[in-house]
Amino acid sequence: MLQPTRLKYRKVHKGRNTGIATRGTKVSFGDFGLKAVGRGRLTARQIEAARRAMTRHIKRGGRIWIRVFPDKPITKKPAEVRMGNGKGSVEYWVAEIQPGKMLYEMEGVSEELAREAFRLAAAKLPIATTFVVRQVGQ
């Protein structure tokens, strides 16, 4: 599971996920990409589940890049605990996703295979996505 190894602070404020992605919006490494159309949070488990679905489908061929990293801790208090007494302990890690963010990239496979692999991966994710192809000269 993906999570940071060294942290300056263990817990963060909730914040608001607004705006659109300005960085990490183009296909940079592979030939095909899975781009976020909606906004939301991807947990480390969801990122891994989608990666596994793609890897199983393309079998031995191709290479996959994960372009997002879950660097935000989400805390949770235990069940039936009274309010107050500080912030809960870290439960899991998420990546905040804005529209336009490239989630995964792939190369070394045909477009049909990549399209199907990304379709299987998108089924594991809670946000709307689209398939993109690298533009010539990009």
Curated annotation (Swiss-Prot):
Part of the 50S ribosomal subunit. Binds 23S rRNA and is also seen to make contacts with the A and possibly P site tRNAs. The keyword Nucleotide-binding does not apply. PANTHER family: 50S/60S RIBOSOMAL PROTEIN L16 (PTHR12220), LARGE RIBOSOMAL SUBUNIT PROTEIN UL16M (PTHR12220:SF13). NCBIfam families: rplP_bact. Pfam families: Ribosomal_L16. This is Large ribosomal subunit protein uL16. Belongs to the universal ribosomal protein uL16 family. The gene is rplP. GO terms for biological process: translation. Keywords: Ribonucleoprotein, Ribosomal protein, RNA-binding, rRNA-binding, tRNA-binding. It comes from Laribacter hongkongensis (strain HLHK9). GO terms for molecular function: rRNA binding; structural constituent of ribosome; tRNA binding. Transmembrane segments: none annotated. The lineage of its organism: Bacteria, Pseudomonadati, Pseudomonadota, Betaproteobacteria, Neisseriales. GO terms for cellular component: cytosolic large ribosomal subunit.
